[in-house]
């Protein structure tokens, strides 16, 4: 198992493309959305991926393929709407505020995406994960306690949203954070840890030296291969533990 994880976690050796992957158009409350499903050869669980602030694109598709390579079905959920892929900073900020500013709608979009994912995967248990904005949505959904059969939540350089009190049965959380990230900052992370301790949550935090925000974004100006590789390996171990493999 260790050898397989190391191979899958090595981004340099990774060959993108799931053997069974497809874009999926679906509806939530009469509105069209476009997700992406990547099937594992012999799935041991389902991973729901929440996209970054620019919407679902090839980055999330690649990550979904990587999850499938680890042996888990992956569904990249769309919370912006089909065709809504903002290109400017202003448009991206507006899109994230629209989603995060309406908790009821955000929850409906996430549950609708999960419902669609379950049409494609027979796996019962689910881990929710996301990048940046997607990590924030992931933790916001963890606070609601509304994801049925959730066994874990993982956030890559996401923020820590306010919300209702943490449910007592919240599944384990995995937080991966850049050491020089200012959005969220180390102070924000410390506040989350204090809150998590008070709520009695099960959580793990990894901090990567010298890594800035968006350290996992391939080709981006803040990409750090060391932090990306280490965080992906940690996430792989998290999946193995949460799905009992």
Annotated model-derived regions:
Residues 16-18:
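N-terminal signal peptide c-region/cleavage motif recognized by signal peptidases
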Residues 23-121, 217-219:
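Serine-hydrolase catalytic machinery in alpha/beta-hydrolase-like enzymes
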Residues 197, 202-245:
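C-terminal catalytic histidine-bearing segment of alpha/beta-hydrolase fold enzymes
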Residues 175-177:
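Short beta-strand/loop motif that positions the catalytic acidic residue
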Residues 180-184:
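Acidic catalytic loop of the alpha/beta-hydrolase fold
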Residues 63, 185-195:
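Short alpha-helix in the alpha/beta-hydrolase fold that links the catalytic acid
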Residues 110-169:
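Primarily recognizes the serine-hydrolase "nucleophile elbow" in alpha/beta-hydrolase
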Residues 168-173, 201-202:
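Short, proline-enriched alpha-helix->beta-strand connector loops that line the catalytic pocket
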